[in-house]
Swiss-Prot record:
Protein name in the entry: Very-long-chain (3R)-3-hydroxyacyl-CoA dehydratase
PROSITE patterns tied to this protein: CS (PS51203)
Top EC class, one word: lyase
Family: Belongs to the very long-chain fatty acids dehydratase HACD family.
Major localisation: endoplasmic reticulum
GO molecular function, one term: 3-hydroxyacyl-CoA dehydratase activity
Cytoplasmic topological domain: 1-149, 211-212, 264-282, 341-362
Top-level taxonomic group: Eukaryota
Transmembrane segments: 150-170, 190-210, 213-233, 243-263, 283-303, 320-340
Length: 362
């Protein structure tokens, strides 16, 4: 190295397996750091003690090191990490006994040999304790069986709702508005199957197969099944209404994102576009689905009132009859309360999965 070259201030520290060099240069540009024949060579442009210039230095290490240094440039300095070939404690950094003038200990990271050994021992103990704790946790012999069941469940539901969505979309393009009025007769069997199978989601939550809370699952499953089996299934007059098309369509679109997301999660796979769709699509679709359910209830109330279906007459002097249409009006209020509970839950889930990550303060 030429005598006229500028050398930056370099601070060093060590552990049993690593060497740390902190080069006091700010705004570093074009750093060239290499190790050959156990000599580290450094050259870079940056702002040091002599202003903005090109600085360089070389260090011949006391003992063999790995030839691949790791560099990390910050606005204020450049950090170099070098791996020792053998775990040992060096009495000095350089092969030459006299310390170069530009080199000094890094007291921010400095440990003597006993401190370093204590740190190494603590890490080993922490690793051993972690292994002991993991060994104490009982292994679930049915883990793979449970995972296989959840994957198959979500796959079947995804295929079922995909069939509903594709069938309705094709019919809409071919028949136009006419497809609105016979949706129930062509789609109901598959919807019955999917919504009956959805009862398993409540069971899965009850027995702890999934970590999803129970109440949102109960609200959604029983809410949909009440509309499907009680309101639509029992009134032929409702089965030809256009609202059935929109109701089934919104339900199926929501599940096209939900079930594949859960299926991939069971396999330990995260696909970010699908995660975004899972926790974003509900924002327009859940209100639209809730609106379709409300319209369905409102249209069915006069029919239940006129036919007296499911109304209960009590044998008493006042001849009081509990009208099912009145219960539907009460249920209409409960519907919006249930939607609010699910909206709140989904909003929290969205913040958890898509919100900004909190940075830990050092």
């Amino acid at each position: 190295m030429a005598d006229c070259s500028l050398r930056p201030h370099v601070h060093w520290a060590q552990r049993h397996r690593e060497l740390y060099l902190r080069v006091e240069l700010s705004d570093v540009k074009n750093p060239d750091v290499s190790i050959a024949d156990n000599v580290l060579r450094f050259r870079a442009q940056g702002h040091g003690a002599k202003g903005d210039n090109i600085y360089e230095f070389q260090i011949e290490f006391l003992e063999p090191v790995e030839p691949k240094p790791v560099c990390r440039v910050t606005q204020r300095q450049l950090n170099i990490t070098v791996q020792k070939k053998e775990s040992s404690w060096w009495e000095r950094l350089t092969k030459q006994e006299k310390r170069p003038l530009f080199l000094a200990p890094d007291f921010d990271r400095w440990l003597d040999e006993s401190d370093a050994e204590m740190e190494l021992k603590e890490k080993e103990e922490e690793k051993i304790n972690k292994m002991k704790i993991e060994s104490r946790v009982p292994k679930d012999p049915f883990k793979h069986l449970k995972k296989g069941y959840l994957i198959m469940y979500n796959l079947v539901q995804f295929l079922g709702f995909s069939w509903i969505f594709v069938n309705m979309t094709v019919r809409l393009f071919i028949l136009g508005k006419d497809s609105f009025y016979d949706t129930f007769h062509t789609i109901a069997d598959m919807m019955y199957f999917c919504q009956t199978l959805a009862l398993m989601e409540i069971l899965n939550s009850l027995i702890g197969l999934v970590r999803s809370p129970l109440i949102p699952a109960v609200i959604q499953v029983f809410g949909r099944n009440f509309i499907l089996f009680v309101v639509l299934g029992s009134l032929e007059e409702m089965q030809s209404k256009a609202v059935v098309f929109f109701l089934f369509y919104f339900w199926s679109i929501i599940e096209l994102f939900r079930y594949p997301y859960y299926m991939l999660s069971c396999m330990g796979i995260e696909w970010k576009p699908l995660t975004w769709l899972r926790y974003t699509s509900w924002i327009p679709l859940y209100p639209l689905g809730g609106l379709a359910e409300a319209v369905c209830l409102i249209q069915s109330i006069p029919i239940f009132s006129e036919t007296g279906k499911f109304s209960l007459g009590l044998p008493n002097p006042l001849n009081v009859t509990i009208q099912f249409s009145f219960l539907l009006q009460m249920y209409l209020i409960a519907l919006f309360l249930g939607l609010f509970v699910n909206f709140r839950y989904l909003y929290k889930q969205r913040k958890q999965h898509l919100g900004p990550k909190k940075r830990k303060m050092k």
